[in-house]
């Protein structure tokens, strides 16, 4: 499975904990992430992550392109809904593409945990 990992700044620590908690499962899949998120994940885990640009520098658009081209199967995007993002149009476009192309999307830790638990059960 091809999985994207994205987290806004205030959610990066939560994403790192999520990847630590599910490292065994995630290590069996191809992972992609925006630059800063992916770098931090690799610093704190043994996971191999294919890096895109940082979100505000076009990374969200790169992930969106992967969705539109059928190159992603699942997106974990830990969003910070309480902080305005300078690249909010890119974020909205990425979320829209998940809906258009029917790619499962978890935008918080609880949903992401449920996805992993379900996938492990298969």
From Swiss-Prot:
Q: Does the keyword Metal-binding apply?
A: no
- Which GO terms fall under biological process for this protein? methylglyoxal biosynthetic process
Q: Which residues form the MGS-like domain?
A: 1-122
> Which reactions is this enzyme annotated as catalysing?
dihydroxyacetone phosphate = methylglyoxal + phosphate
Source taxon at top rank: Bacteria
What GO molecular function terms would the record report? methylglyoxal synthase activity
- Record-level GO cellular component terms: cytosol
Stated family? Belongs to the methylglyoxal synthase family.
**Name of the protein this chain belongs to:** Methylglyoxal synthase
Query: Which gene underlies this protein?
Result: mgsA
């Amino acid at each position: 499975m091809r999985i994207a990992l994205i987290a806004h700044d205030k959610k990066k620590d939560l994403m790192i904990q999520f990847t630590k908690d599910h490292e065994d499962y995630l290590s069996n899949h191809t992972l992609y992430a925006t630059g800063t998120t992916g770098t931090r994940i690799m610093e704190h885990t043994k996971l191999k992550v294919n890096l895109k640009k940082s979100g505000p520098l076009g990374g969200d658009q790169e992930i969106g392109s992967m969705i539109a081209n059928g190159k992603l199967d699942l997106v974990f995007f830990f969003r910070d809904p309480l902080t305005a993002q300078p690249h909010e149009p890119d974020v909205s476009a990425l979320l829209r593409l998940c809906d258009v192309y029917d790619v499962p999307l978890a935008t918080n830790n609880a949903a992401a945990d449920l996805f992993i638990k379900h996938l492990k059960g298969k």
